[in-house]
Amino acid sequence: EQLIKDILSGIIVAIIALPLSIALAIASGVGPVQGLYTAIVAGFFISFFGGSRVQIGGPTAAFVVIIYGIVTTYGTDGLIVATIMAGIILCIMGLCHFGSLIKYIPYTITTGFTCGIAVTLFVGQIKDFLGLDMGAVPSEFIEKLGAYAANITTTNPVTVAIGAVALVILILWPKVTDKLPGSLIAIIVTTAIVYFAKLPVNTIGSVYGELSSEFPSFHMPAFSYKLVQELISPAFTIAILAGIESLLSAVVSDGMIGDTHKSNAELIGQGLGNIFSGLFGGIPATGAIARTAANVRNGGRTPIAGITHCITLSIILVVLMPLASLIPMTTLAAVLLVVAWNMADWTSFFHLCKTAPKSDMIVLVATFFLTVFFDLVVAIEVGVVLAALLFMKRMAETADVTAWKYADEPDVTPGEAEKMRDIPHSIRVFEISGPLFFAAADEILAITSDKSTKVIVIRMRSVPAIDAS
């Protein structure tokens, strides 16, 4: 009985993953087929070797920004190298039992770059949604907006109308039923309208040509020391993103099925998935929260569901891929507009801006703007360093050195004197509280004595940690 549920759930999740995989691949600057390759190859290894029984892997919106930047700078081969490197890093993290360390990435950083990715993804769909007649879209955010403004007069009203129809379906369909994804219905309806009415709207086929229906083939990219050196930072960022999103997805699914995932095994599964995704022409992948949740809601409880999802996508690749060339580009843009809207947790973002400590707000806003105006690699690097520095400053401010008073001092009341220990004036007692580390080392300077002092007692029972400083 459970086997049948897993198989049916895998088929449903494959239907959900199909339009998303194609749309995310196009938004990342690669061919639509590469999105399916990723969902098939990486999805299989993530389900088979991962530490969660119900995890569904594949391309996600979190990678769009960094993939687009890598493809623009280093081409497809550079992306493959970065994907394989990220997979190796993930495997090393899993083997070194770093699964629990992902929780040390501050919430302000994940919220900041997630909202930044959402804005970048949203803006990146404007060309296809409006049907603008323009060349390649610049990778930089400001230049992108300038290019849109310069070509806004080339907007295609028919394209906008089809995109609007897709948006309406995507927004209203979940209120009708959640058995079939709104993205699939939007694609079927708008594709039929454009095809039978012969409307002048760009489709996947008109932009990318005929799509391949062949299985992915093994391809070993050309590695060089210089390329590896240049891509180590983007690869590390991909690995961190994959680790965060996959473990978050695993935690969410644990709550839904009453299970506990193995975080280190999950990282190894993610690593193998990315290594083989790169070797078979795919892009970076991770556990997808929405697809994993859909798997659980439809009865999936074992890795069979994830493997069935991969097999179903393989069949679709071989049998139905030529039909995918008929899908309007504006429909895929509409799908990603909704994805961008849903992934951005603006409620948490503005709540943190209002209520979080000033240091946390600085990290949040800095990570957000760096993601939008520079790139995700810079945003995460600066965000982590900034969060660490501000946290150390906060901890240093909690460290304090207090000198004990003598019972016969003028400002000591009789009631206080009764509770105090009677110690001779030749002994000075200092009490240190808070962590004593390099940023708080100056507090030691508060320990002073006069000529009458023969003994200094330093009480450190309130010091939770101390370093070599």
Residues covered by each model-derived region:
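Structured cytosolic domains appended to multi-pass membrane proteins
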Residues: 403-406, 411-469
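Transmembrane helical cores of multi-pass ion-transport proteins
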Residues: 1-408
